Amino acid sequence: MNILKISKQTLRNNIKIIREYIGNAKMCFPVKANAYGHGIEDIVENTHDLVDFFAVANSLEAFRVTAVAKNPVLVFGVIYYEYIEKMISENIRVSIQDYEYIEKLEQIAKELDKKVYAHININTGMNRMGVDYNDACRTIQRAYESDWLILEGVYSHLACADNRDHPTNIKQKNRFDSIVKFTKGLSQDIICHLSNSYGFLGQKGICYDMVRPGILSYGFLPEFYVDRVIREIKPIARLLSKVVKIITLQEGEGVGYSLIYRGFEGEQLAVIPIGYGDGFPRELGDRGFVNINDVMYPMAGRMSMDGLTVSLGINEYDVKVGDTVELISAIPRNRNSAFSIAKQTNTIEYDIMSTLNDRIIRKII
């Protein structure tokens, strides 16, 4: 059995630290991609009293949130019409991505005789989604004056927040400042938000009315220097499995597909029942590390869909079937932390955690 053990205390402590750091700004907690792989329902259930909003990528994720909490939920992505009626009935916040979408929302709202809560996404330089910057004020004005929309928020997204010295950050901030000025001229109550985790840590003065700290809430820090208080944030999860078999190699034998790992006679290998079919990175095969009984062991051979093997050498520490295996550590400096795994596989912690799928059990402790 493969289990992602999540510390409720660490999760809640991370959010409390962030709330202290952002002052009076609201907190919108992103739980998209199954709460970055940690499990939407469990994460929402254990944090809803600490945050103001939740944010997700699509309608189906939003419904999973509203099933367990009453907080407002913002959908970042495009809304599919087969779900829009249920979204409106549950007061799920819709993102407006272009001017023309306002009229479509109004038509549906009239049919349901219910107003739609909306946030307008402005493209200030990410060039992915959102209303074009040059069309922003017209779109905001149109939505604000609509009889069928409640314009609750206006937001944008930083393209280069992970590089705090990138000139695009200033360009986007200046553009958003002009949008905020226009928006607040209509109503001081409209929530303006720009920053994700890297945004409000790397750029001073851009918390605005609300921040959206995703990866930081789950315990992953940017590499650049941040405030000492933020340094108290810790990863919330450990990925664990069990040794299911011990194999002793004979002379000249290898292990796994293509037998790329060739051991020595008498070498012992531990078989672990987790593989890329569980969302664990295949690239770790033959170069990653796991922790068994506080000893690090190297992976041996290619990772398969459902399993991997690690070399125990001569098994001087007497690893046995049934021993617990730590695949992802909650200690960032460890060789099997999400941070270290991301470095080894040339990706980011978001990727390592969010691709862990539902073959892995989530357990709040």
From Swiss-Prot:
InterPro entries the record matches: Ala_racemase, Ala_racemase/Decarboxylase_C, Ala_racemase_C, Ala_racemase_N, PLP-binding_barrel
EC number: 5.1.1.1
Active-site residues per Swiss-Prot or TrEMBL entry: K32 (proton acceptor), Y257 (proton acceptor)
Reactions listed under catalytic activity: L-alanine = D-alanine
Record PTM N6-(pyridoxal phosphate)lysine, positions in chain: K32
Binding, substrate: R128, M305
GO cellular component entries: cytosol
TM stretches of this protein: none
Coiled-coil parts of chain: none
SMART domains (UniProt xref): Ala_racemase_C (SM01005)
Cofactor field: pyridoxal 5'-phosphate
Pathway: Amino-acid biosynthesis; D-alanine biosynthesis; D-alanine from L-alanine: step 1/1
Enzyme class, broadest EC rank: isomerase
Domain of life: Bacteria
Molecular function in Gene Ontology: alanine racemase activity; pyridoxal phosphate binding
UniProtKB keywords: Isomerase, Pyridoxal phosphate
Record flagged with keyword Isomerase: yes
GO-annotated biological processes: D-alanine biosynthetic process
UniProt-listed PANTHER family: ALANINE RACEMASE, ALANINE RACEMASE, CATABOLIC-RELATED
General function of this protein: Catalyzes the interconversion of L-alanine and D-alanine. May also act on other amino acids.
Family classification: Belongs to the alanine racemase family.
Name under which the protein is recorded: Alanine racemase
